[in-house]
């Protein structure tokens, strides 16, 4: 199965948590059906990306990275690559690369979708493309509390935060954390 086929199957079968997530799911499925290159960075004005929110095993801490280009704290994630076999594999690769944590186990079922504008998404660093929309498919991974991350070239910092004291008030991130915790904590 190709990455495109996996993305279409995953999102077609996914049960959204609420009406907002369902609308995004439908939008992503429509985009995949309309664009054979929807899983590539070249697809404009929108393409799929994959992300992972890393939680401590007790569900009380979240690992975030201070994104080098955006200058904001995010979950791990990025563009899909041709050799990714699935959305979950891409989410795993991105989280491993950006956190430096080996042995991550990523839940293959997405936990959250996020559509957001990115002004710095370029194929050629010297050629601006305008605003590109990332259709982010987010997963969750759990690691032992206190696991030491490593800062990658894509981040200015990587650190643990209490889930009730994250450095953002963006509802999208707060929803991701809530849904991820609901998925992994009893």
Please identify what each model-predicted range represents:
Residues 13-51:
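Acidic, metal-coordinating catalytic segment for phosphate/diphosphate chemistry
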Residues 1-7, 181-186:
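Actinobacteria-biased recognition of intrinsically disordered, low-complexity terminal regions
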Residues 138-142, 149-179:
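NUDIX/MutT-family hydrolases
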Residues 100-147:
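Active-site segment of metal-dependent pyrophosphate-handling enzymes
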Residues 60-101, 164:
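Conserved Nudix-box catalytic region and its N-terminal flanking loop in Nudix hydrolases
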Residues 39-75:
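N-terminal strand-loop-strand
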Residues 3, 8-19, 42-45, 81, ...:
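Membrane-topology and secretion signals of cell-surface/extracellular proteins
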């Amino acid at each position: 199965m190709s990455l495109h086929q996996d993305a279409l199957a995953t999102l077609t079968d996914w049960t959204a948590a609420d009406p907002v997530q369902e609308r995004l799911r439908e939008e992503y499925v429509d985009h995949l059906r309309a664009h054979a290159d929807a899983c590539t960075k070249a697809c404009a004005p929108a393409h799929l990306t994959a992300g992972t929110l890393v939680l401590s095993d007790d569900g009380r801490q979240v690992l975030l990275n201070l994104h080098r280009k955006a200058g904001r704290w995010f979950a791990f994630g990025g563009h899909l690559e041709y050799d990714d076999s699935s959305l979950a594999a891409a989410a795993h690769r991105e989280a491993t690369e950006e956190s430096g944590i080996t042995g991550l186990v990523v839940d293959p079922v997405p936990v959250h979708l996020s559509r957001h504008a990115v002004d710095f998404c370029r194929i050629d660093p010297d050629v601006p493309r305008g605003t590109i929309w990332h259709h982010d498919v987010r997963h969750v991974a759990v690691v032992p509390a206190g696991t030491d991350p490593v800062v990658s070239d894509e981040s200015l910092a990587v650190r643990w935060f209490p889930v009730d004291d994250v450095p953002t008030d963006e509802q999208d991130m707060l929803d991701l954390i809530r849904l991820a915790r609901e998925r992994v904590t009893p």
